[in-house]
A protein has these predicted regions:
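Single conserved hydrophobic/aromatic residue that forms the stacking wall/gate
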Residues: 1-8, 12
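Short glycine-/acidic-enriched loop or helix-start segments at secondary-structure transitions
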Residues: 9, 41, 143
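Charged helix-capping and loop-helix junction motifs
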Residues: 12-17, 48
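Short, contiguous, pocket-lining structural segments
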Residues: 14, 41, 125
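Buried hydrophobic packing segments
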Residues: 18-19, 52
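Glycine-rich phosphate/pyrophosphate-binding loops
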Residues: 19-45
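Electrostatically charged, flexible surface regions
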Residues: 44-158
Length: 158
């Protein structure tokens, strides 16, 4: 998919959603993106996909794991390798944009700028011509906050 899927916004991108659905069906799943808006090197992404599928066939991932893959949009010969990464982080999105033809409609603003793009992140890997492979889990529960939310809910007089 030519939609960029790097950073914490990944969890609601269509390719990640598709991979989650595949995992719910019991299938090993990969969310794959060519990290560019121009998308010139689909052959590179295809070659990387073949390598990853062959590896999954030999050594399957844990049931509750999907991998989010971002491939730099460059020739295969320029790829520096494949790295296991974590999701980077972005600043908040740009403000919404009012539709010029229908002022009652608004468009979601552009993605925020990279906030955490340091070594080990998907952003850093792709910027340095590495394929980024980020393991994702389906359970989004923020376990350390369960007690705090429980205490917060006690303040509701219901």
């Amino acid at each position: 998919d030519p939609e960029l899927s790097r950073g914490l916004g990944d969890v609601y991108k269509r390719q990640v959603a598709g991979a989650i659905e595949g995992r719910f069906l019991g299938l090993p799943s990969i969310a794959m993106s060519l990290a560019s808006w121009e998308c010139k090197h689909f052959d590179t992404a295809g070659n990387i996909a073949k390598l990853l599928v062959a590896q999954i066939d030999k050594s399957p991932l844990a049931y509750n794991t999907i991998i989010n893959v971002n491939v730099p949009d460059i020739p295969m010969t320029e790829i520096n390798g494949i790295k296991s990464t974590r999701l980077g982080n972005r600043h908040k999105s740009e403000p919404s944009i009012q539709d010029l033809n229908d002022p009652s409609l608004y468009w979601i603003g552009e993605n925020g700028k990279e906030a955490d793009n340091g070594e080990g992140t998907d952003f850093h890997a792709v910027t340095n011509n590495f394929v980024s492979v980020t393991p994702l889990q389906i359970d989004l529960t923020k376990y350390p906050e369960i007690k705090q939310v429980s205490d917060w809910l006690e303040k509701i007089n219901y």
